[in-house]
From Swiss-Prot:
Record's keyword annotation contains Transport: no
Binding partners and assembly: Monomer.
Superkingdom, taxonomy of origin: Archaea
UniProt protein name: Chromatin protein Cren7
A GO MF term: double-stranded DNA binding
GO terms under cellular component: chromosome; cytoplasm
Subcellular location: Chromosome; Cytoplasm
Keyword DNA-binding: yes
Gene from which this protein is expressed: creN7
InterPro entries the record matches: Cren7_sf, dsDNA-bd_Cren7
Keyword list, A-Z: Chromosome, Cytoplasm, DNA-binding, Methylation
Transmembrane regions: none
């Protein structure tokens, strides 16, 4: 799987909106539905990891 390289605007755990590159992106979809893409991000201030929704046109990577 290729590494993620495009930045996405997300809200961090502290509530700030920043542009981050996800560590990994995967698809969550229940049977028979479209689903959403979720990314794993690391907060630059605290170093903690969190998940956030990414746009549907973002490639699956990680």
């Amino acid at each position: 799987m290729a590494a993620c390289k495009d930045a996405v605007k997300v809200k961090t755990l502290s509530g700030k909106e920043v542009e981050l590159v996800p560590k990994k992106v995967w698809q969550l979809s229940p049977k028979g539905r479209k689903g959403v893409k979720v990314g794993l991000f690391q907060d630059p201030e605290t170093g903690k990891y969190f998940r956030a929704k990414v746009p549907d046109d973002y490639p699956i990577c990680g």
